[in-house]
Amino acid sequence: GSNMCNNELSKYSKKIITPDNRNHFTVLDVGYLPKHTFVYYPLYVKTNNPTLKTAKATIIKETSANKSTSNANAKVYGTITEVSPELYQLILTKEGIYKNYYKPVVKVITSLVSKEKYKAITFVMTNKYKNKLPISSISPYPSELYESMIVKAAVHYQFPKKYINTYLKTLK
């Protein structure tokens, strides 16, 4: 989602004051998570915050339970990024981990280039907030700005065009 966008990570990185004023993240690689699908889901929370009134990115595991829509070749593309402990704490807050909107889950990500395997933390929307009856004020689609940020990062990191057009773009 938006965490693969350098501008988004830089925005949060600037909030961290360190004596050496170092960068708090490094993109190590681009990879994919097999047997998962990228989706936008409305985050069903009662809020006046307009940024939470549109759908947000998450990933879902392909299982035999969702066989009718399941794709054996499903994969989610993303960046493999090393972040400082300070930036990680800010990301946890940003992702609503402490409010149970998302949960951090360790997954094995495969490099697109070297096929090296990385253990990485992904953020997955919790069922508590994803599988609720729709609240009429929440859009089932991402905001133009949010989607654009994700699509621009995907283009920058050269994700497959078919993947971008199929999963990341909802606003044609």
Across the structure, where does each feature detected by a protein language model lie?
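A glycine-rich, hydrophobic/aromatic-adjacent loop/helix-cap motif
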Residues: 2-172
